């Protein structure tokens, strides 16, 4: 599954990014209540997509950081599935990244790489492309690219 979670920010200031819009006194008045509501709505979508079984692989875009991902997999009912996280802070000025969640017992990671976006061979201040190669529980090899343009 792939899901653009549309500005999944915590409500803490990150001095290295332009996240002021998502602070309690920012333009969106991003309170802890709004953060928790967003967190719960995202977990509900992931569960609904999986039906009776959780999705083995979940690509996400527009996540602020590893903290929100850890909250998603540890502080919601998704915790019982023990999702693992692949994420790296990107050079994006707003601080939004791509990530992959996966079930370790269903998907074995062979390779991961974050591919920078370049213009004229110069890395741009934007989200990297996340490349993940792995083997499913049915022995199929997948090459996954998670990106957001």
Where in the sequence are the language-model features?
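N-terminal, active-site-proximal structural segment of metallo-dependent hydrolase catalytic domains
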Residues: 1-82, 86-96
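Structured beta-strand-rich core segments of catalytic domains in phosphoester-bond hydrolases
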Residues: 63-141, 149
